[in-house]
Amino acid sequence: MDKRSIMKYERSQKLFEASQEVIPGGVNSPVRAFSSVGMNPPFIKRGKGAYIYDEDGNKYIDYVGSWGPLILGHCHPEVVENLKAVLETGTSFGAPTEIELKIAELITGAIPSVEMIRMVNSGTEATMTALRLARGYTGRNKIVKFNGNYHGHSDGLLIKAGSGALTHGVPNSPGVTPDVAKNTITAKYNDIEGIMEIFKQQGEEIAAVIIEPIAGNMGVVPMTNKFAHALRKITEDYGALLIFDEVMTGFRVSFGGAQSLYQIKPDLTCFGKIIGGGLPVGAFGGKREIMEHLSPVGPVYQAGTLSGNPLAMTAGYTTLSILHNNSGIYEELEKKAQKLEKGFKKIVKELQIDASFNRVGSMLCMFFTKEKVSDLETASTSNTEIYSQYFRAMLSRGVYLAPTQFETMFISDAHGDVEINRTIEAAYEGLKEIRNNPSI
C-alpha cells in the first residue's frame, strides 16, 4: 500500500516568500533553496532523534543530519544537557577556556597525525587557513585540488568544486580573480598519472595538495587505496604538504577518520561538522613542526573572535566523548547503512532502474547512472531529473534526503530498524512510481 503522506506547506511557503525579500534566494546556503529538485523548501522547526518537523507539522526521517554533524541524531539528551549548563555560565569570552584544552586533547589522542590543533569557526576557515599555513611553511605558492572536491567557499578553492557549486552549475565562481586562480592547479580525482604529470611539471612550486579522502560533495566518492598512497609518496618526494579535508569524514567513517581507513598520515588535517556537535565549528591540525608556524608562536597569522567558544566546544566534546566511550556505535552504524544499501540495491534491481552505489561507513549515495562513480566525470553521468523526482517522491512519504544528487545520505545512531525499514519501503514505492512514468 502506498504510504505517501498528505503534506501541507502553507506556512513554509509564506516564510519562503518573505525570506526572499530580505535574504538572497531566501536561504543562507544555496542548496537549501531546493531549486535543483523543482520545489520550494519546507522550513524546519525542530528535530528529535532521527526526525525533523517542519513549520506545517510534517514529520520526516532525516538523512541530512544538518549536512553531517549530527551523528548521534537531533537533540541528543547529553549534548542538550551540557549545553544548557554552559549557557548558565557564559556563551563566549574571547579568552582561553578549559573545554578548548579538553577537546584538543581528545582529538590529538584520536588522530595520530594531529600533534597540535587550532580551532576556528567553519570548515571554510579551516581549509583556508591550512593552505595559508602550508604556503608559509613551504615558502611556495601553488596548491593542487581535485575536480569535484569541495573545501568551502574561499576564493582559491572555488575552482572546479563540488557541493552547491556543482549542484548549481557554478564550478568557477564570479569574483574569484585570475591572480588567485592562477595558483590553484586542478587535477582529476583518482588519476595517478595525472597528478604525477602535474608534479613533474610544477612540483617545486607546489606548497600542498588538498583532498577529500572520501569526496562527499559529489555524492560519496572514495579515493582508491592505490591513489591515496601515491599521493602520500609524491608529496613527500617533492616536499609538498598533503592536506586531508576531513570536515565531513572526521569522526564519521571511523573514530580515527578516513586517514585511519587508508592508514596514511597527512601533514595537515581539516575538521568540522561532528567536532562541533551541530554548532558552528572548524579546526585544522597536524605535525607540531608545521603547526608551530602559526601565530602567536610563528609568523603565519590566524585569529577568530568566536574560535573555541564554549558552546561549540561543549557540544563537540560531548559528542566525541560519547563516540569514544561507545566504540560499538561505529559497528552499529555500519550495520544500519549496510541494511539500507542492500535494500536500495534490491529495489533498483527488481525495478530495472539504472543506479550505482557508493558507501563508506554511514555515508551512502545512490547515483542514477549505470557508471561506477569514481570521479567528477562519472558522477556527472547521473540522471539528475530522475533524482529530482525520487527526492520529491521520498519527501512526500516522509523521508528527507539531500535536495541534490551530489550530496550524501548520513545515517545516525538515532536511526533504528523502524526508520530503515520505512525508508526502504518508501524508496520502493517512489521508484516504482517513477519507473511506471512513461516520460522516464
UniProtKB/Swiss-Prot annotation:
Organism lineage string: Bacteria, Bacillati, Bacillota, Clostridia, Peptostreptococcales
Signal peptide annotation: none
GO biological process: protoporphyrinogen IX biosynthetic process
Principal cellular location given in the protein's record: cytoplasm
Keywords, ordered alphabetically: Cytoplasm, Isomerase, Porphyrin biosynthesis, Pyridoxal phosphate
Keyword Metal-binding: no
SUPFAM superfamilies per UniProt: PLP-dependent transferases
Cofactor: pyridoxal 5'-phosphate
Full protein name: Glutamate-1-semialdehyde 2,1-aminomutase
